[in-house]
């Protein structure tokens, strides 16, 4: 549960003439729990981040938010939430989502807007966002605040000219976490504000290289290993099957077995530990994390070219944690990204990697909460 001492900070904010305290709520739901930002409706620069609370099913999430609602009432019973947004993993249909980064039967991870406490998630003033949709709105918010560029480094500058992270036309925003997310940001003179299009393109099936490619044999064996685990060896895996927190342990299992003959139980392999071992130079882990990123760049290439993007943004916390490794293998990533059947399509396509921590999902949910709050009745 969240600390009431943090919630008390909202009493420092401006109230309305009738004494009401107008606020906005941004919430980001991850695989292990949720983060919440409460901000002043009158000034979005005045906010309190409540940190992390554990939740791995619908009941736990609703209990945490109901407890938060009671704590806000206890601190100031005249508060009114004018806009709320909550970021979730999984397709959203008719105000309902089955969260894909939680374990268990669909019934225990199905969430509707009606399930949420209505005082902090009011009807008609609350919205679900796909997690990468929220991240993309966070990129827009960071650009508006002039804090976007400082958190990214442009890769492959010998292949593309310098330019803004958020392109003037189309930008693909990608992130590897418990899954692989992708969203499109479109800026056009036809619209006053940038448009975000959430996608499920992390679930596109992998495009394998052919027989004459130098990496064909090893790549084919790795893809088959992943297919054996998920699809009885019959179907081509999706990019998320390797470019995710569940995919990295499978890659490590493959390379460790190839080197030692030992088949480690995949449930005993922790993705974070594999990444740390790779940073320390352990060969099996280096091979696994490198493959993890090679396929990530292949997914980025497919997404950015298919959507005619000028910029491709690799974002969120894992990208920051693995930044030294990314920079170390940059030449191999560059070769992968620009190796394409239509090389002229790659001209000028910029790639950015996040290098410092900034919670784009919280920024994005807060951005949308204020957009809802300021929307005319």
Swiss-Prot record:
Entries under CDD domains matching the protein: ASKHA_NBD_GLK (cd24008)
Catalytic activity reported: D-glucose + ATP = D-glucose 6-phosphate + ADP + H(+)
Example of a GO biological process term: glycolytic process
Enzyme class: transferase
Recorded superkingdom: Eukaryota
Keyword rRNA-binding: no
Annotated binding of ATP, by residue: 27-32
A molecular function (GO) term: ATP binding
Keyword terms of this UniProt record: ATP-binding, Glycolysis, Kinase, Nucleotide-binding, Transferase
Family (UniProt): Belongs to the bacterial glucokinase family.
Protein name per the record: Probable glucokinase 2
Lineage of the species this protein comes from: Eukaryota, Metamonada, Parabasalia, Trichomonadida, Trichomonadidae
């Amino acid at each position: 549960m969240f600390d009431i001492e943090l919630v008390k900070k909202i009493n420092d904010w401006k109230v309305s003439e009738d004494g009401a305290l107008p606020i906005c709520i941004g919430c980001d739901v991850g695989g292990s729990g949720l983060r919440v930002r409460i901000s002043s409706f009158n000034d979005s620069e005045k906010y309190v981040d409540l940190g992390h609370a554990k939740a791995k099913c619908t009941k736990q999430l609703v209990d945490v938010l109901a407890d938060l609602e009671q704590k806000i009432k206890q601190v100031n019973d005249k508060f009114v939430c004018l806009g709320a947004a909550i970021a979730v993993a999984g397709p959203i249909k008719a105000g309902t989502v089955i969260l894909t980064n939680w374990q268990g039967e669909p019934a225990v991870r199905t969430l509707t807007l009606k399930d949420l406490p209505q005082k902090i998630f009011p009807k008609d003033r609350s919205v679900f966002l796909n997690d990468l949709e929220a991240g993309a709105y966070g990129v827009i918010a960071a650009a508006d605040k002039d804090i976007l560029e400082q958190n990214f480094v442009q890769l492959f500058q010998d292949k593309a000219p310098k330019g803004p992270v958020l392109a003037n036309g189309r930008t693909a925003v990608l992130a590897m976490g418990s899954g692989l997310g992708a969203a499109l940001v479109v800026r056009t003179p036809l619209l006053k504000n940038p448009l975000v299009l959430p996608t499920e393109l992390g679930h596109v099936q992998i495009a394998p290289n052919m027989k004459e490619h130098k990496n064909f044999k090893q790549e084919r064996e790795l893809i088959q290993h992943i297919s054996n685990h998920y699809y009885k060896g019959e179907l081509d895996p999706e990019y998320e099957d390797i470019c995710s927190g569940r995919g990295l342990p499978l890659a490590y299992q493959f390379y460790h077995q190839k080197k030692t003959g030992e088949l480690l139980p995949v449930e005993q392999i922790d993705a974070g530990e594999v990444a740390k071992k790779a940073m320390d130079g352990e060969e099996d882990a280096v091979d696994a994390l490198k493959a993890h990123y090679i396929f990530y760049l292949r997914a980025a290439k497919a997404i950015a070219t298919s959507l005619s993007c000028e910029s491709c943004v690799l974002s969120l916390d894992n990208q920051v944690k693995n930044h030294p490794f990314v920079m170390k293998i940059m030449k191999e990533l560059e070769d992968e990204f620009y190796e394409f059947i239509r090389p002229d399509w790659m001209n000028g396509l910029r790639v950015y990697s996040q290098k410092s921590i900034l919670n784009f999902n919280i920024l994005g949910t807060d951005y949308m909460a204020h957009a809802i709050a300021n929307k005319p009745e």
